[in-house]
Design a protein with these regions (language model features):
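Conserved NAD+-utilizing ADP-ribose enzyme module
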Residues: 1-37, 60-62, 73-81, 87-189
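Short, well-structured hydrophobic secondary-structure segments
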Residues: 39-71
Length: 189
């Protein structure tokens, strides 16, 4: 499948030298600075959950994010490069980017509008104004079934198809030089 990914220019150097690029912990720490621990845990969860759907070697812990549409790809910026890549089906996983936002914020990923409404009513019944507190604080100890319901729903990011295909993204766990079809460098505009 054809994808587009924006990466730091150092990724191109690594691809030229080694023939592949693998996201390393230090890259995430450098990019995200003071909030890197949040992203490291989030991406580690994502990889663990993704292993239910795709074979990912144990030493690969962090995903490379891919746009499924050229129209929706991140645009080039200074010190960044766009790679157009053709990735074998066994090497990528598609997820619902809209639902990924729910996971990022520790929210319940509903099956549909009716399920979302029922969930919101359940939160209201218990007087819970901020559902993320069920996962991020000790409040979840008082509502363990509700907390577990939220956590179990997160795998739906891989199974619920969005109404709008532009809300899909791909991930892979390495880029190989032979997958690169085009490289676009930042031209200053």
């Amino acid at each position: 499948m054809r994808f587009w990914t924006r990466q730091h220019e150092a990724v191109w150097d690594e691809l030229q030298k080694t023939g592949q690029y693998i996201v390393k912990k230090e890259y995430i720490e450098e990019k995200n600075d003071t909030i890197s621990e949040f992203y490291l845990k989030l991406y580690e969860w994502y990889t663990k959950a993704a292993r239910k759907y795709i074979d990912i070697p144990e030493d690969l812990k962090y995903p490379v994010w891919l746009s499924v549409s050229e129209d929706m790809m991140l645009q080039p910026t200074e010190h960044a490069i766009i790679f157009e890549v053709e990735i074998p089906e066994s090497e990528y996983l598609i997820c619902n980017f809209d639902k990924w936002g729910y996971r990022v914020n520790y929210f319940y990923v509903p099956l549909d509008e009716a399920d979302e409404k029922a969930h919101m009513e359940e939160l209201k019944k218990y007087g819970i104004a901020s559902e993320d507190s069920l996962v991020t604080t000790s409040k979840g100890n008082f509502y363990p079934l509700l907390r577990q319901k939220i956590i179990k729903s997160w795998d739906r990011i891989f199974t619920i198809q969005p109404d709008d295909p532009s809300l899909m993204v791909g991930t892979c766990w390495k880029l190989k030089k032979e997958w690169i079809k085009e490289v676009r460098f930042y031209d200053g505009e």
